[in-house]
């Protein structure tokens, strides 16, 4: 999705509120006749040809700074008052009535503010209209003031507009709301909401769940078991949880949907906690360590950490990475995450653009000293020579070779050669990582001939290198892995999955040299998948019929026979693949293969054949699922009325007997799992809760000797 910066409107009015000037501000420099601002101009003000200025009011400015900017924009040297027909700006009334300097009022009720524009005017990212008038032309002469414009603001704006047309504002956004309120929506209020959803023709999923000692009551169209006595959960059309309430508090993820559903309910809300975290994925990488060259405290505040910025009011934090930006805000402001991303991308272009000179000597020479360095008896740093030897043979337009020497000539005519006094590192090669990232051919000296490598072919023969080539440098586990990277597994799984496998590295680093097969972590193809909760993990594992590793836990799907060959692993909530990599010593290419999933599958506590738990009237509950007339039932259930199900009382003796085994169970609801287990035992024994303890214990010891205290075959 490409973010479009909305135009802004400045209206300068005279003594009788007649419009003297209408200024249409846009960084694009042209009028957008489809914008809401132009519609307002044309329809409500009857202005079809406003003044078009390639300008932009920064929404991060304080009101005092905005006044200085507007005085400069309009070339006014007198005291002015600014206001808006949509929001209060500098002045407001205690009852939040919209302030207008031409309307008589009791002046003692006025409150003056110097807040930040995006806070005072919440819709400013999409629709900003500011009215300006000379205070002497109003009945409120004493409320006017004159502010000098901050020259740094104008300097920043000029820089911004200079680079604007080159900015890549393509972005994808994930949002995570953390809004928790105390509410008066008790059982009756929740019933009203579920009734409204059931009566409406929507794609929303919902469930109202009530339970006590004797009954479980459910209504809705998304039947799942919860562990709360009262719970209303509503999922949006994308199957994401919109909001959930236990009757005392409510967690809201989809503010718009919740507002629609309670519009005719007298809902009282008291905020307990609230913030929104946006993760913005960028189309073009940025420099994560931003350093500002001019005073920009009116936009962002720098911190001691190079990749973290704060908003000017220090209430919004911005964490920068190469390919994404995380923005955390306290209160929901429409499209503020897109606007702040625009500012970050602009600042990155203005002050932190990557130098792309192809002449290695003109780039940072620190590359040579750190990456292609001379250490002890290793002379890997190439030297610059002034001419070619007579006996040299031309290999390509930029590469010459003799029996004792090789010379590479870059695009600027600089000649590099490897002359090792020890006679070892005399073969010219190139650092593949820099070629992949920036198409830079940086020479380095190697022990063996490098002509077989893809990077050599690209730099010497101008052949394209596939973007899918994997870097031979293996990262430590814990970092999110990009498409061209791989990382080690966690230590415990690295030892387990790679037992007996061999891998060799270049001396003194983690650059893969050779392996006939080794398990590592790789990014998944396609869209990024995030699993934030245990519920998400369980749903993913069962939907994909796959194995997933999260922390030190291995998750298996319910049905052993449906398990596929893939193994996934969670890194910072993002799903990655476990793959087997192979590399030959004389090749750069790293090949990936399916992992040896049998190693993990053998750990599965498998039920080798389907067992019927209960059967009646053509309905059959088995270890493989629920069947009706022999066909697996997988349709969504829906209920527009209240249904009652008896709650079951279980035997404490059975749960205590298996308690040593239960401590190894990992599930979303352990109590529910234990209760289900105990019910199945009771059904097998055809017993009730009143059976004597001596009888039940003896039968358990006879049929279930392996209950966790010791392992028996």
Swiss-Prot record:
Source domain of life: Viruses
Pfam families tied to this protein: Pox_VERT_large
Keyword Transcription regulation included in the entry's annotation: yes
GO molecular function, one term: DNA binding
InterPro entries noted in UniProt: Poxvirus_early-TF_lsu (IPR007532)
GO biological process: positive regulation of DNA-templated transcription
Alphabetic keyword roster: Activator, DNA-binding, Transcription, Transcription regulation
Subunit and interaction comment: Heterodimer of a 70 kDa and a 82 kDa subunit. Part of the early transcription complex composed of ETF, RAP94, and the DNA-directed RNA polymerase.
Function: Acts with RNA polymerase to initiate transcription from early gene promoters. Is recruited by the RPO-associated protein of 94 kDa (RAP94) to form the early transcription complex, which also contains the core RNA polymerase. ETF heterodimer binds to early gene promoters.
Family: Belongs to the poxviridae VETF large subunit family.
Name of the protein in question: Early transcription factor 82 kDa subunit
Source organism of this protein record: Yaba monkey tumor virus (strain VR587)
Protein encoded by which gene: VETFL
């Amino acid at each position: 999705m490409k973010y479009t910066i909305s135009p802004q409107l400045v209206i300068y009015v005279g003594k009788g509120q007649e419009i003297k000037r209408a200024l249409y501000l846009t960084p694009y420099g042209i009028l957008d006749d489809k914008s809401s601002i132009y519609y307002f101009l044309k329809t409500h003000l009857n202005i079809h040809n406003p003044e078009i200025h390639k300008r932009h009011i920064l929404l991060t400015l304080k009101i005092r700074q905005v006044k200085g900017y507007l005085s400069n924009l309009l070339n006014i040297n007198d005291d002015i008052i600014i206001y808006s027909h949509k929001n209060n700006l500098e002045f407001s009334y205690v009852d939040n009535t919209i302030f207008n300097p031409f309307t008589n009022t009791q002046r003692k009720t006025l409150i003056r503010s110097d807040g930040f524009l995006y806070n005072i005017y919440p819709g400013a990212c999409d629709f900003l209209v500011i009215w300006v008038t000379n205070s002497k032309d109003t009945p409120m002469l004493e409320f006017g003031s004159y502010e000098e414009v901050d020259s740094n603001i104008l300097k920043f704006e000029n820089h911004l507009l200079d680079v604007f047309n080159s900015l890549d504002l393509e972005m994808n956004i994930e949002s995570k709301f953390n809004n928790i309120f105390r509410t008066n929506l008790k059982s009756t209020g929740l019933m009203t909401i579920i009734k409204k959803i059931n009566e409406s023709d929507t794609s929303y999923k919902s469930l109202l769940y009530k339970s006590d000692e004797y009954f479980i009551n459910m209504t809705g169209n998304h039947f799942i078991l919860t562990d709360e006595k009262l719970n209303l959960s509503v999922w949006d059309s994308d199957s994401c949880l919109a909001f959930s309430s236990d009757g005392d508090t409510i967690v809201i993820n989809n503010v718009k949907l919740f507002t629609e559903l309670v519009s005719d309910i007298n809902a009282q809300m008291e905020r307990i906690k609230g913030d929104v975290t946006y993760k913005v994925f960028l189309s073009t990488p940025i420099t994560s360590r931003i350093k500002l060259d001019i005073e920009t405290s009116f936009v962002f505040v720098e911190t001691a950490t190079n990749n973290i910025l704060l908003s000017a009011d220090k209430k919004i934090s911005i964490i920068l990475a190469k390919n994404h930006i995380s923005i955390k805000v306290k209160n929901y402001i429409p499209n503020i995450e897109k606007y702040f991303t625009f500012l970050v991308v602009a600042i990155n272009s203005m002050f932190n653009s990557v130098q792309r000179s192809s002449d290695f000597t003109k780039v940072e020479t620190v590359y040579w000293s750190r990456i292609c360095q001379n250490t002890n008896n290793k002379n890997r740093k190439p030297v610059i020579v002034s001419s070619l030897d007579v006996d040299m043979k031309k290999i390509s337009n930029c590469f010459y070779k003799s029996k004792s020497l090789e010379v590479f000539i870059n695009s600027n005519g600089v000649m590099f050669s490897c002359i090792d006094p020890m006679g070892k590192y005399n073969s010219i090669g190139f650092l593949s990582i820099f070629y992949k990232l920036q198409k830079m051919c940086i020479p380095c000296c190697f022990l063996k001939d490098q002509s077989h490598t893809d990077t050599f072919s690209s730099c010497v023969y101008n052949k394209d290198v596939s973007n899918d080539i994997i870097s031979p440098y293996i990262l430590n586990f814990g970092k999110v892995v990009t498409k061209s990277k791989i990382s080690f597994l966690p230590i415990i799984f690295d030892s387990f999955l790679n037992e007996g496998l061999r891998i060799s590295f270049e001396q003194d680093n983690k650059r893969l040299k050779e392996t006939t097969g080794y398990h590592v972590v790789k990014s998944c193809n396609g869209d990024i998948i995030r699993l934030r909760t245990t519920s998400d993990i369980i749903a993913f594992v069962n939907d994909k019929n796959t194995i997933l590793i999260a922390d030190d836990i291995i998750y298996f799907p319910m049905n052993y026979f449906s398990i596929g060959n893939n193994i996934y692993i969670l890194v910072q909530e993002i799903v990655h693949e476990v793959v087997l990599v192979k590399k030959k010593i004389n090749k750069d290419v790293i090949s990936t293969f399916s992992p040896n999933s049998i190693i993990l599958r053998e750990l599965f506590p498998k039920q080798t054949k389907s067992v019927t738990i209960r059967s009646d009237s053509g309905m059959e509950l088995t270890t493989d699922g629920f069947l009706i007339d022999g066909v697996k039932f997988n349709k969504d259930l829906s209920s527009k009325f209240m249904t009652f199900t008896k709650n079951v009382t279980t035997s404490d003796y059975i749960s205590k007997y298996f308690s040593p085994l239960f401590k190894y169970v990992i599930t979303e609801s352990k109590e529910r799992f234990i209760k289900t287990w105990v019910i199945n035992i009771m059904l097998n024994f055809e017993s009730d809760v009143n059976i004597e303890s001596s009888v039940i214990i003896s039968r358990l010891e006879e049929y279930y000797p392996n209950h966790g205290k010791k392992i028996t075959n």
